[in-house]
Amino acid sequence: YQYQVFSKSPVSGSPTVIKVADPFSNLIISSYDDNQIPENSFPNLPKFPENQIGEFTFINKSEKYDWNITEFDKPKKEDLIIYEILVRDFDKESSFQNLIDRIEYFKNLNINAIELMPVMEFEGNESWGYNSSYHLSLDKFYGTQNKLKEFIDLCHQNGIAVILDLALNHVFGRSPLVKMWMDDPDNNSWGGPSNENPYFNQSA
């Protein structure tokens, strides 16, 4: 589904009518990026609606994940030994499955935490991830929700915490919370937050 938002008094430089996916989506299908997502990373990717553009919320009815580790004692801050990973560049597969396959490598490093650079839905597929568009939706290029959970579960089984790097204010263009209060002087549905945006600062 998709929302069509009308504004009787739009902020200056912002469109009067926009179509956006749900800002709180946990799965986004996109006319911009989905044709570049490998089948082995996200099997059975929902098909984008014909004759539509933009992004839609897809209600995800994926199977429940059964955690092996339901309680995990995280390391104290002063004891953390963190290994930071950009999933895209860690290995050629660029996927959560790739991280799962390398668990022995992580164990041999004698680390106790892995920090994932942003894995939330971001603008495009080739990015460091610090330009999030949907903060509660995983970027499908890396894999499914359950595959990320499997990786976290496996790390916990081996005494490794997983930290998610969040970039909350680095947003523009495709974020619905930007589009509803957007600085769009060219009237092309593209821009950054306006000075009236209640969620984001104009300068990060």
Model regions and ranges:
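The feature marks proteins involved in alpha-glucan
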Residues: 1-80
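Substrate-binding/active-site clefts of carbohydrate-active enzymes
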Residues: 63-64, 69-80, 86-204
